[in-house]
Amino acid sequence: MGLPLRSLEELGAQLSFYGRSLAWTGRTLRRYKKEILRLLAEVSFGRGALAVVGGTVGVIAFLSFFTGTEVGLQGYAALNQLGTSNFVAFLSAYFNTREIAPLVAGLALSATVGAGFTAQLGAMRISEETDALEVMGVPSLPFLVTTRMIAGFVAVIPLYVVGLLSSYFAARTITTGYYGQSAGTYDHYFQQYLPPVDVLWSFGKVIVFAVVIILVHCYYGYYASGGPAGVGVAVGRAVRTSIVAINLLDFFLSLAIWGANTTVRIAG
């Protein structure tokens, strides 16, 4: 079988896996509430070394803070050359909300929660724990995959609130504290160029990212093979696939939401 056919077969297997995982959502919510709650805590605050930095919430907050700082630094420096430094708040309201914060949140989820899920499911597959669940009459797909998808779906909303506010705070702090721009001027333009609907769409993008990331990572972990080395290979493949998926989704979602019209008008 040639490479194109193998790739098509792999894509079909993945889509079938995603569909079956989503189809189990209703029954999983009824049957496995305790497991979902346990995973919620793990997704938000992490375990082991990840818990030291505050879990996923800490990673997203730190990454968003520093990207927001860069938006403030570079935005002010560039606009100041044109005599329009007052509009640096527009950059924060526009780019952080629509593109930067959602992408940062997606990458953070992939690197922390997603990679962890792949390793967990891969280890369970290698040690035959997944098969043991089936022998005991527990469907492994909803118990291992759908529960994680639901936990990620619920957890990503407060996580993203922290990340988005962190990026806003960083851009404002660097602009008003370091460059000395009036806080009133910054807040005026920030509020003028931040329509609430953009924030809602931003949350919508992140929710889609979270579901896709977790499904991709769970797929590679669920079907891992080849011993401990195979788990490492599965994690690498999952991270690469999820990063590509995030960027493709970001492009098409942004095109669908803001491609034909815009909620922000600078002139005219």
Where are these regions (language model features)?
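Membrane-interface helix starts
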Residues: 27-37, 41-56, 243
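Selective transmembrane-helix segments that form parts of the transport pathway or gating/packing helices
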Residues: 48, 52, 100, 104, ...
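Hydrophobic alpha-helical transmembrane segments of multi-pass membrane transport/permease proteins
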Residues: 50-69, 249-252
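Membrane-interfacial helix-loop-helix connectors in multipass membrane proteins
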Residues: 67-97, 162-207, 216-235, 260-268
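Short cytoplasmic-facing helical segments at TM-TM junctions of multi-pass membrane proteins
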Residues: 121-146, 228-231
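Membrane-helix cytosolic exit motif
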Residues: 221, 244, 248-264
